Amino acid sequence: MGKITFYEDRGFQGRCYECSSDCPNLQTYFSRCNSIRVDSGCWMLYERPNYQGYQYFLRRGDYPDYQQWMGFSDSIRSCRSIPYTSSHRIRLYERDDYRGLVSELTEDCSCIHDRFRLNEIYSMHVLEGSWVLYEMPNYRGRQYLLRPGDYRRYHDWGAMDAKVGSLRRVMDLY
């Protein structure tokens, strides 16, 4: 199991809260989050309670201010620990409900367009492991956690559109 510590102020100062499991509502523990230390595991942070809003993927390391995790503000309201798996496999579909051209990945892909000539993915089936989807190539832009399961439409993974730029396997070792 992973371990993450949230700090209200930059540079690991101020009130802190240590967490080692999923938490749908962090508001009772701190009012703002300006720095984070991930001691172990991989985590997805959410700007709103109940795993809603912008998502931020963090792995082991120190994040002395919210810009270090590409945050837009000091609002972190929920978090998920992402379990480690040794194998990863995901199927991508060019249309919703698993229709159209299908492509499969087992490794990180820094540019979906270069690899598959697709700019949009409308549905996915995560067969093994957890993945982070990025809206732009080279692991940039909005992030979405994809855990094993079915994603019939882009709304199912929390996106506002079908734009997919890159995909990365969630692994504790980078």
Swiss-Prot record:
**Looking at the keywords, is Repeat present?**
yes
Q: Which SMART domains match?
A: XTALbg
A Pfam family = Crystall
Q: Where does this protein have coiled-coil stretches?
A: none
Name the keywords, alphabetized: Eye lens protein, Repeat
Question: What are the GO BP annotations of this UniProt entry?
Answer: eye development; lens development in camera-type eye; visual perception
What other comment is given for this protein? There are six different gamma crystallins identified in rat lens.
Q: What is this protein called?
A: Gamma-crystallin A
Query: What gene is it encoded by?
Result: Cryga
